[in-house]
């Protein structure tokens, strides 16, 4: 399984790379200011991940382009934290400031589809962010996949293989995180009930 990791200059990227490596993925890591999306699309990736990062989607280099064009090419793409925000913005959503949350655990509820398949309905996840996706103007092309503490914790594109999570599945504060990443790697973003 060949995976592209877009590194938004964040230390959590290394945790994602480590987990996916342990799960058997062949990973190419590209910094957000060093890749050409057209060339990357031609490299035969099976999956793509847009990593967390300290900036906004507008300052995340190729992240917005990858999170839009890879799913449009049929490549299952996961956005984590900043990547989640980039996914929403790439398809017309709004990212807004939020009270900073760093190293906090929250309980979320989810829809049991795609990366959440087979997990308990209520999950504890680790959060590190100061921006969120605004729910009030979430584009119709998305469905909400998880929520917690009054914040969108996950969104999924209704027709393309693209999903975002505000929390950090690669954090030790997210006990089920590695299982979520394993499901993404093995199943892409195909739900157990056949829907996306």
Positions of PLM-derived features:
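Acyltransferase
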Residues: 172-196
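Catalytic beta-strand/loop cores that center a nucleophilic Ser/Cys/Thr
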Residues: 114-160
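Cysteine-nucleophile active-site neighborhood
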Residues: 43-118, 181-182
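Phosphate-binding/catalytic loops
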Residues: 159, 164-175
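Short hydrophobic/Thr-rich beta-strand motif most characteristic of the beta2 strand and flanking loop
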Residues: 26-32
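Extreme N-terminal starter segment of soluble prokaryotic enzymes
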Residues: 1-4
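Two-component/phosphorelay signaling modules centered on CheY-like receiver
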Residues: 17-26
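Short amphipathic alpha-helix with an adjacent loop that forms part of the alpha/beta core around
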Residues: 35-44
């Amino acid at each position: 399984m060949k995976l592209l990791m877009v590194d938004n200059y964040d230390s959590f990227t290394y945790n994602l790379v480590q987990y996916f490596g342990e799960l058997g993925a062949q990973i190419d890591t590209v910094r957000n200011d060093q890749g050409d999306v057209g060339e990357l699309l031609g490299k035969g990736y099976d999956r793509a991940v847009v990593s967390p990062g300290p900036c906004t989607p507008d300052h995340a280099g190729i992240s917005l382009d990858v999170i839009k064009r890879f799913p449009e090419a049929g490549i299952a793409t996961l956005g984590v934290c900043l990547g989640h925000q980039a996914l929403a913005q790439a398809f017309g959503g709004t990212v807004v400031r939020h009270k900073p949350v760093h190293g906090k655990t929250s309980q979320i509820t989810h829809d049991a589809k795609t990366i959440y398949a087979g997990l308990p309905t209520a999950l504890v996840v680790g959060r590190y962010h100061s921006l969120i996706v605004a729910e009030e103007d979430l584009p119709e092309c998305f469905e909400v996949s998880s929520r917690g503490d009054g914040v969108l914790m996950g969104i999924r594109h209704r027709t393309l293989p693209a999903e975002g999570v505000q929390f950090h599945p690669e954090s030790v504060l997210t006990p089920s995180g590695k299982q979520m990443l394993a499901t993404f790697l093995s199943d892409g973003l195909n739900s157990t009930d056949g829907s996306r």
